[in-house]
Design a protein with these regions (language model features):
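Short glycine/Trp-rich loop-beta-loop segment that forms part of the substrate-binding cleft
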Residues: 6, 24-46
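C-terminal recognition in membrane/secretory proteostasis and scaffolding
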Residues: 12, 30, 95, 125-257
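Active-site loop architecture of trypsin-fold serine endopeptidases
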Residues: 18-20, 38-53, 59-85, 90-134, ...
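Conserved catalytic-core segment of clan PA serine endopeptidases
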Residues: 1-16, 23-27, 205-207, 218
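Short, conserved beta-turn/loop elements at beta-strand boundaries and strand-helix junctions
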Residues: 2-6, 57-63, 148-150, 233-235
Length: 257
C-alpha cells in the first residue's frame, strides 16, 4: 500500500530470521544531535553504506512539493541517489527517520551536505493507516491559506511573520462551522505554534477526523480561540472541485487544508 503525498509505502516481507528495529521518537530530536544514515548510494554494489552527521534543522517543508505532506529532518550525513528509503538512526540505535531527498547546487546529483529524512513519527502515523485501511485518512479544516509576509503582517496588525492567513473558508466546512473567517491568522494548533502555511497543513492533517482541535488565531488585531471538529480530508480531485480554483490561482494563494 502506498501514500504518495508523504512519499511512503508499506510492504509485506517474510519475517523469518529477521529482527525488528527499535523505533525512536523524532519529536525529541534536537538540532546538533548526531545521526547515522544507512543505505545503498549509487546502486547495490555500495549497499550497507554507513555515514554520520548531525541534525541541521527540523520541520523543513516545501522541499519536494507544496502539495505533499512534509516535515523533514534536515541533516548532513552523506546521502546520495540510491539512499532513498534508507534508515536514519540516533546514537541509541533507534530509527528516527527515513531518508528521502537531498538538495544540490542544480548542476550535480551528488551530496552537498543537505539531506532530508521523513520523521519516524510521521512514518508511524502513515504506516498504521496503510496497514489497517490501505489508505491514510487525514484531518481537514476546509480553508485556503497563505504565508504571512511583511505587508500582510502590517495590514493585519500582527507582531511577527509567524502563522497562516485564511484566504478562503469553504462553505459548510469544519472551519465555517467553528466560526473561522477570511483574513483570520492561525498562530497555534492545540498549543503548538504555527510557523507558516505548510506547518499548519501538517498540523491539521496529522489529526484524525472528528478530533476536537483548538485553534489560536488573530482577528482584527486581537487573539481569539476556537474549537473545531476536524472533517475527513478529501482526495486531490475532490479538493480541486471543492475549492473551485484553477491551479494558477491556487499557486498564487497558497495551500488547501
Amino acid at each position: 500500500a502506498t501514500d504518495p503525498p508523504s512519499d511512503l509505502a508499506v510492504i509485506k516481507v517474510d519475517p523469518n530470521g529477521l529482527s525488528t528495529v527499535a523505533l525512536g521518537n523524532s519529536d525529541q530530536l534536537s538540532v546538533g544531535e548526531w545521526v547515522v544514515a544507512i543505505g545503498s548510494p549509487f546502486g547495490l554494489h555500495l549497499n550497507h553504506t554507513v555515514t554520520a552527521g548531525i541534525v541541521s534543522a527540523i520541520g523543513r517543508s516545501s522541499v519536494m512539493s507544496r502539495n505533499n505532506f512534509e516535515d523533514f529532518i534536515q541533516h548532513d550525513a552523506a546521502i546520495n541517489p540510491g539512499n532513498s528509503g534508507g534508515a536514519l538512526f540516533n546514537l541509541d540505535g533507534e530509527l528516527v527517520g527515513i531518508n528521502t531527498a537531498i538538495a544540490t547546487d542544480g548542476y550535480s546529483r551528488a551530496n552537498a551536505g543537505v539531506g532530508f529524512a521523513i520523521p519516524i513519527n510521521m512514518v508511524k502515523r502513515v504506516m498504521e493507516d496503510l496497514i489497517s485501511d490501505g489508505k491514510v485518512t487525514r484531518g481537514w479544516l476546509g480553508v485556503q491559506i497563505q504565508d504571512v509576509d511583511e505587508g500582510m503582517a502590517k495590514a493585519l496588525q500582527l507582531n511577527g511573520w509567524n502563522g497562516a492567513i485564511i484566504s478562503q473558508v469553504i462553505k459548510n466546512s469544519p472551519a465555517e462551522d467553528a466560526g473561522v473567517e477570511k483574513q483570520d491568522v492561525i498562530i497555534a494548533v492545540n498549543g503548538v505554534k504555527v510557523d507558516d502555511s505548510s506547518n499548519l497543513k501538517n498540523l491539521i492533517s496529522s489529526g484524525r477526523p472528528h478530533d476536537k482541535t483548538k485553534l489560536t488565531l488573530i482577528r482584527d488585531g486581537h487573539e481569539k480561540k476556537l474549537t473545531v471538529t476536524l472533517g475527513i480530508r478529501p482526495g486531490e480531485k475532490e479538493l480541486a472541485e471543492t475549492y473551485r480554483y484553477g491551479e494558477k490561482l491556487f499557486d498564487i494563494l497558497g495551500l488547501r487544508v
